[in-house]
Amino acid sequence: PQSPPPPHPRDLTNRIRRQRDWCLRESAIGENRGIVLGVPFIEFLAPGLISMQIIQQSFAHSSSSILSGKMMGNIVDLVGSPLSALEVTLAVIFASITRSIMISFLSILVFSIFIDIRLENALFFVVFLFLSSFSMGAMGFIAGMWSDKWENMATVTNFIIVPMSFLSGTFYSINRLPEILQKISLINPFFHMIDGLRFSFIGSSDGSIKFGLIYLFLFSLIVWFISFFLYKKGYKIRN
């Protein structure tokens, strides 16, 4: 089997364009959508779309990097290099973070042309951007190690990553959900990624920002340790 062609810059442009079109459509009916968390719905929506791209892009980068190496056979060069498991896992994850940073700033730039989007707290933005990208990069690393072919990766993306990012408050406030679903949302790491990043833009949130920071920090450590352990043991790559 052959790996797909490398990502083309046009792919990133298309993703940004889709987000822009989303915002334009919602702007057209924005007056009818009311106020969410103290801001117009369109200003509530934009940070959610940016957050969703950060989540999906950081996961896609690390997962495709590992799986491409496995399928093309050049991962043996990485395994046989003098780099430690710590160095390899962090290198792949930080590459995912770099991609997420580029996507986030491009998205903010495009959205600022069409809507009033402001960054209320730059420190929280940087912290949540880092934690979200780091944890999703580590999850992508794990998925890449586990997958044997692109169909396996598509299954993870389509049935886990995309649904969890959509069902984590991207398009709505969880206060509108039944109480049991609100409690379920609070244990979903994707919710805290989106909620924290949205807080940095609009200054209000659905959940506790302090709890979200601690939760994502611990979650990042856990998924990084799993990725480190799998690579160190040579899971599905030693053969």
Predicted regions: what they are:
Residues 1-26:
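Single conserved hydrophobic/aromatic residue that forms the stacking wall/gate
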Residues 18, 25-69, 117-125, 155, ...:
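Transmembrane helix-boundary elements of multi-pass transport/secretion proteins
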Residues 25, 29, 66, 75-78, ...:
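Hydrophobic alpha-helical interface/terminus motif in multipass membrane transporters
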Residues 40-111, 140, 159, 165:
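Hydrophobic alpha-helical transmembrane segments of multi-pass membrane transport proteins
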Residues 48-56, 130, 146, 156-167, ...:
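Hydrophobic transmembrane alpha-helices
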Residues 68, 73-80, 148, 158, ...:
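Short amphipathic alpha-helical coupling elements at transmembrane boundaries
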Residues 85-157, 204-228:
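Alpha-helical transmembrane segments and their short interhelical loops
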Residues 115, 165-222:
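Membrane-interfacial helix-loop-helix junctions in multi-pass membrane proteins
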